Amino acid sequence: YIFNDFMLTKEGAATLDEIAVRVYATVVSTPSKEYAVLDGGTKTFYMDIVPETPPYYYPGYAVVAGNDDLQLLRMNEEHGILTSKKGDTGLHVGDIVELIPIHVCTTINQQNEVYLYDGETLRKEKVAARGMLV
């Protein structure tokens, strides 16, 4: 796999540091301190896994980088709901959240473009096989 993903960490084939893909979502609403609404839902994070079930007990549809307390357990097409194990997410409207996809193949397949960073330069590329089966 060229990107690695969280699934591969459960298999022992990759570490979090070896996952090359990040999705950045913006907090668009915080109706309660217990949850925050992101501008990334099922059109961004695929639902081909069931969080918190055997055999791997994935912590959600994506992992919040650097924050094991936050979980992405609910989504609709356009929005994801981040909750906190501790009760208060600490997030505010406008905050940018860095997420690691559980399954990168389906995440990339749903995007029109990706941004590539080589340590110096950031460039935008079209996803050539976007929406394709192969």
Annotate each predicted stretch with a short phrase.
Residues 1-134:
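Active-site anion/phosphate-binding pocket segments in diverse small-molecule metabolic enzymes
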